């Protein structure tokens, strides 16, 4: 072959001075633009093998998950391993998160049938109401009746008292009357009839309608001192105790619906009953509780 027509092999890039520089096997950032040479990415067998290995691992993982799903299709999936969830604390260790306390449900204290206090509360006051069935002139009643007072600026009713039974009546212009102070149901009814007869003698067509006992108050003594602080702590849903405001503990019983005033001396006042039996039942319910908080000196 002719040497003039032969093309010498590429040895490098021409410098501005026309001399040859050593051959450059890879793309260099020093290569000037517009030379007509386009760099090509270098591919190695190692990079291809890594990609193939990753694809193969992904395929194996997908196959294994599909097989597990087919085998466990009839079972409930678990988000956590059953061994990682334990409810009992490890021996010797205190659980970090104590279980929340269950709110207390108000329960009426019950008394065992075999236990009896042997104490009978005494009735101290009975409040009853009656309708006289006619309109009344309170000024006329106050002027003509004995033991009657009327001050409309202070209270819009005539206050009348009798000695036997020793009671007090509140007489309103509408014809309604409230009788207080009796010690028994019979005394309350008798006193209300006497007040109605007084109004009749003054010239009013008074009747005796709808007599009803509205409230009964009883009291007793358990004969031992009581720790009121301990009682209010264990029966918070029933009781309230503010010694700076009132020296007694207020206990609101659910059944029967009675309010008890309990004092540290052992005295107990029961109020809110409609019949005498509710007073007795409420005291029998509270007595074993009071025995549990007996103050020992």
Curated annotation (Swiss-Prot):
GO terms for cellular component: nucleus; transcription factor TFIID complex. HAMAP family: TATA_bind_prot_arch. Residues 56-78, 104-114 have a biased composition (Low complexity). The N-terminal domain is extensively phosphorylated. It is found in: Nucleus. It comes from the Eukaryota. InterPro entries: TBP, TBP_CS, TBP_dom_sf, TBP_eukaryotic. Keywords: Developmental protein, DNA-binding, Nucleus, Phosphoprotein, Repeat, Transcription, Transcription regulation. Sequence repeats lie at residues 123-199, 213-290. Belongs to the TBP family. General transcription factor that functions at the core of the DNA-binding multiprotein factor TFIID. Binding of TFIID to the TATA box is the initial transcriptional step of the pre-initiation complex (PIC), playing a role in the activation of eukaryotic genes transcribed by RNA polymerase II. Members of the TBP family are differentially required to regulate transcription and development during early embryogenesis. Binds to the promoters of select genes. Residues 52-116 are annotated as: Disordered. GO terms for biological process: DNA-templated transcription initiation; embryo development ending in birth or egg hatching; transcription by RNA polymerase II; transcription by RNA polymerase III. This is TATA-box-binding protein. One of its GO terms (molecular function) is DNA binding. Belongs to the TFIID complex together with the TBP-associated factors (TAFs). Binds DNA as monomer.
């Amino acid at each position: 072959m002719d040497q003039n027509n032969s093309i010498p092999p590429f040895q490098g890039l021409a410098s501005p001075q026309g001399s040859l520089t050593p051959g450059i096997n890879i793309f260099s950032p020093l290569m000037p633009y517009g030379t007509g040479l386009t760099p090509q990415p270098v591919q190695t067998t190692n990079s291809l093998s890594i990609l193939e290995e990753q694809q193969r691992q992904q395929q194996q993982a997908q196959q294994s998950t599909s097989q597990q799903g087919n085998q466990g299709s009839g079972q409930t999936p678990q988000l956590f391993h059953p061994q990682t969830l334990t409810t009992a604390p490890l021996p010797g260790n205190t659980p970090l998160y104590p279980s929340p306390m269950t709110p207390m449900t108000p329960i009426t204290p019950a008394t065992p049938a075999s236990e009896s206090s042997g104490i009978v509360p005494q009735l101290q006051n009975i409040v009853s109401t009656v309708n006289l069935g006619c309109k009344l002139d309170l000024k006329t009643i106050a002027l003509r009746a004995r033991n009657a007072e009327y001050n409309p600026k202070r209270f819009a009713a005539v206050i009348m008292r009798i000695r036997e039974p020793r009671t007090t009546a509140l007489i309103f212009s509408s014809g309604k009357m409230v009788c207080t102070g009796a010690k028994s149901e019979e005394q309350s009814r008798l006193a209300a009839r006497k007040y109605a007869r007084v109004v009749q003698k003054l010239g009013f067509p008074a009747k005796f309608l709808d007599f009803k006992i509205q409230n009964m108050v009883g009291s007793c003594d358990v004969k031992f001192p009581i720790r009121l602080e301990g009682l209010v702590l264990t029966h918070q849903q029933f009781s309230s105790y503010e010694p700076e405001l009132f020296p007694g503990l207020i206990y609101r019983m659910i059944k029967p619906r009675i309010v008890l005033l309990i004092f540290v001396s052992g005295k107990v006042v029961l109020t809110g009953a409609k019949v005498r039996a509710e007073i007795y039942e409420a005291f029998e319910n509270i007595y074993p509780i009071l025995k549990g908080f007996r103050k020992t000196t």
